[in-house]
Amino acid sequence: MKRYKVYVYNTVDKFWDCYDVIAEDPVDARNVAVQRLIDETGHGLDVYEVTDVCEVKE
């Protein structure tokens, strides 16, 4: 498992946010971040846009 930073943009309130996630690959990291957005905010890709996924080098 690797550590990733997933950057998201809220298209309604116009702000950026970043999620640190542990995942197998960048696609999995994106999916984990989207699920966290849904769990934490009640919104997913209807309000947020994933803008970048970057692996964190240890």
Language model features with spans:
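Short, mixed-charge low-complexity intrinsically disordered segments
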Residues: 35-58
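A short, exposed loop/beta-hairpin motif centered on an aromatic-Gly-Thr core
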Residues: 14-27
